[in-house]
């Protein structure tokens, strides 16, 4: 089954998405997501200029060989642009292979390891009262795992805080330059345990409670944070400190038993090898769109399973519904599954990407359609052209550039 075309689409039905469509001489097509938030055009260019021309004529069934060709053949490898492109190709080829087998992808991977995929949602607010209202709404929808973020008194902007009441959190801003935000670690460390106390006092311990620190703390500050929230039994604290300094997680481990999740910015198994091998984390956050597709994620998950590290894949709506569909198939199969992030998508987005997944009482299922179970409406997508948007940058209150 030969590949006869590979096309790249950049569309913005509310957010910018990069979609790869591979077509074979049998008529079967496959879809892949190559979205890299704020850097969509470089990935699209890499696909168009370097990847798509080299796909033509290749056997679509040779997924592993094609993966190795674009990984080893790149020479300048493992970067986010290269790996996002490889991920999209890999996703599309698995979509084709599962369609050729006339089975949903999770069956081709080895079958279901569970009846549904537990997903966690996002709650947000400018105050604790707003967060409690938002939490109640998501709990009533059936979510069993809920991420909690809140505005911090004395700070105009805080990671995870929606720009208006009732709005979903959207970090990227339209325009030609990134937004600059101010950050105070002391204000954050003083306030955030009070947020978790309020949530547990009102709702108890029935739901899993998650929190994202988004690389903002130093190792000793992260240790202090983890110790301060142990009574509230967080499911995890995410990205407490920049993961480039992987040895520092040993220090955090020595001070707290709050579970740690890391890895949404990782692009390969090499990025997380030390953290997993030394059991410095509990959940690996790599995502199918950035870590080498289904093939790359299988390697990471298999390695992590040796050390009882579970998956907790990054999955906000800055990755397209194609990634979400692929993630749900992967999550349903992978033995060492932990939880899957799910922010939901707007009606506009789902019109461009019709899907077959379902949500019921806190769990999702990818559906039984052959392949990924998702489609792409090219004509509708063309009505939503690329719209430049950038993730913010952060500074301390004295103006020092900090980790966003």
UniProtKB/Swiss-Prot annotation:
Binding site for substrate: 37, 122, 264, 285, 314, 318, 341
Residues reported in the UniProt entry to bind Mg(2+): 212, 238, 264
KW Magnesium (keyword) present: yes
InterPro entries per UniProt: D-mannonate_dehydratase-like (IPR034589), D-mannonate_dehydratase_GalD (IPR053379), DgoD-like (IPR034593), Enolase-like_C_sf (IPR036849), Enolase-like_N (IPR029017), Enolase_C-like (IPR029065), Mandel_Rmase/mucon_lact_enz_CS (IPR018110), Mandelate_racemase_C (IPR013342)
Keywords linked to the UniProt accession: Lyase, Magnesium, Metal-binding
Superkingdom: Bacteria
Gene3D superfamilies associated with the record: Enolase-like C-terminal domain (3.20.20.120), Enolase-like, N-terminal domain (3.30.390.10)
Active site: 159 (proton donor/acceptor), 214 (proton donor/acceptor)
Catalytic reaction annotation: D-mannonate = 2-dehydro-3-deoxy-D-gluconate + H2O
A GO MF label: magnesium ion binding
Needed cofactors: Mg(2+)
Disulfide partners: none
GO process annotations (BP): amino acid catabolic process; carbohydrate catabolic process
Pfam families: MR_MLE_C (PF13378), MR_MLE_N (PF02746)
EC id: 4.2.1.-, 4.2.1.8
Top EC class, one word: lyase
SMART domains attached to this UniProt entry: MR_MLE
Cofactor note: Binds 1 Mg(2+) ion per subunit.
Residues annotated as site: Important for activity and substrate specificity: 316
Classification via PANTHER family: D-GALACTONATE DEHYDRATASE-RELATED, STARVATION-SENSING PROTEIN RSPA
Family listed: Belongs to the mandelate racemase/muconate lactonizing enzyme family. GalD subfamily.
Function: Has low D-mannonate dehydratase activity (in vitro), suggesting that this is not a physiological substrate and that it has no significant role in D-mannonate degradation in vivo. Has no detectable activity with a panel of 70 other acid sugars (in vitro).
Name of the protein: D-galactonate dehydratase family member PC1_0802
Species in which this protein is naturally found: Pectobacterium carotovorum subsp. carotovorum (strain PC1)
